[in-house]
Each structure stands twice: as C-alpha cells, then as structure tokens.
C-alpha cells in the first residue's frame, strides 16, 4: 500500500513551514523589509492577509516574499505550460529515393524536404541501391549534392553524403 501522506520536504515552504533563524523579506509591492525573523515576517504577512513564500533558500540569508500563494502557484504552472508549448524537439524526417529518380519525383522529394526543414525538423536524404546499382555511387553522390544545392536557402548540410551499406545518406538541418 502506498502512503498518501506527503513528507514536509515535498510541500512548498510557506508560512509556518519556513524554518530559518533569519530571512530576507520582500514585501508584496517589491520593497525590501530587511532581514527579520520568520515569526515577525509571518505576522506582517497575516496583517496583509497574504502568505510568506520562500523564494530562494540558497541565498544567504534565505529570501522570502509576501504574496498570495494561490496566485503564485497558478503563475508558476502557467509558466511551465508556456515553456512546454514553446519546446520543440527536432525530429529526423527521412526522404528516400533512388539514384535513377525522374525529374518530377525529385522535385516532389525536394519540396517534401523543404516542408520538413521549414517546420524545424532535420532531414535525412537516403538513396538506396539494389543489386549492382551500388557501382554507380558517384551518381548518387551527385544527386545528393544537387539536393543540398537546391535546398541551400533553407538548409545547411550537417553530414556530407556518405555510404552506409547499401545506402548513401546525407543529413540536412534547418538554417538558424
């Protein structure tokens, strides 16, 4: 069975939970009240019907602020949500083709790669060889170089064309 009671370490340090001999206190309007005892700071906070919240315990002495804790907690959660929204992980999208690709098909692949790059993703351009086609790796290298040239306005080559088994690949990343 899981113990549902939270330890005091997990709880936020507010009001009576602040256990330091002296703290630096900042008022709700941003002015400093100086270095006082937690009991005195708590009395000031209660007079204003607000909470005493520990902002930085690493400072010497620890810094506390008089504020509405519910509002503070809401703002912190809101900031975390915004940060999560803005966070974009660059995925690696793959564009596969053969070295004997037709012109229209090549243009479709270039447009596809361009879309991926504009979305902020990296692109792995892969050319697959079958059977004896591997003898024509120079043509595949030329095709990848052409693709890099066609995409130079939106991408930069992160990894030059190189052979890996029966494939030749090149990595492109979006320009900053």
Swiss-Prot record:
It is found in: Cytoplasm. GO terms for molecular function: ribosome binding; translation initiation factor activity. SUPFAM superfamilies: Translation initiation factor IF3, C-terminal domain, Translation initiation factor IF3, N-terminal domain. It holds the Pfam family IF3_N. Its main location: cytoplasm. PROSITE patterns: IF3. It comes from the Bacteria. Keywords: Cytoplasm, Initiation factor, Protein biosynthesis. One of its GO terms (cellular component) is membrane. Gene3D superfamilies: Translation initiation factor 3 (IF-3), C-terminal domain (3.30.110.10), Translation initiation factor 3 (IF-3), N-terminal domain (3.10.20.80). GO terms for biological process: ribosome disassembly. InterPro entries: T_IF-3_C_sf, T_IF-3_N_sf, Translation_initiation_fac3_CS, Translation_initiation_fac_3, Translation_initiation_fac_3_C, Translation_initiation_fac_3_N. IF-3 binds to the 30S ribosomal subunit and shifts the equilibrium between 70S ribosomes and their 50S and 30S subunits in favor of the free subunits, thus enhancing the availability of 30S subunits on which protein synthesis initiation begins. PANTHER family: TRANSLATION INITIATION FACTOR IF-3, TRANSLATION INITIATION FACTOR IF-3, MITOCHONDRIAL. Monomer. Belongs to the IF-3 family. NCBIfam families: infC (TIGR00168). This is Translation initiation factor IF-3. It comes from Microcystis aeruginosa (strain NIES-843 / IAM M-2473). The gene is infC.
């Amino acid at each position: 069975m899981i113990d549902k009671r939270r330890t005091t370490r997990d709880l936020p340090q507010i009001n009576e939970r602040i256990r330091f001999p002296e703290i630096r206190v900042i008022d709700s309007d941003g002015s400093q009240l100086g270095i006082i005892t937690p009991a005195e700071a708590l009395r000031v906070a209660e007079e204003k019907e607000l909470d005493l919240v520990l902002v930085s315990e690493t400072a010497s002495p620890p810094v506390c602020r008089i504020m509405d804790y519910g509002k503070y907690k809401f703002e912190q959660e809101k900031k975390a949500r915004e940060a999560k929204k803005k966070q974009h992980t660059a995925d690696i999208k793959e564009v596969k083709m053969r070295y004997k690709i037709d012109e229209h098909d090549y243009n479709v692949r270039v447009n596809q790669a361009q879309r991926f790059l504009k979305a902020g993703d990296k692109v792995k351009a892969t050319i697959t060889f079958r059977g004896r086609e591997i003898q024509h790796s120079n043509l595949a290298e030329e095709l990848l170089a052409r693709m890099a040239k066609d995409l130079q306005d939106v991408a930069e080559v992160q990894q030059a064309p190189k052979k890996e088994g029966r494939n030749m690949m090149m990595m492109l990343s979006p320009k900053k």
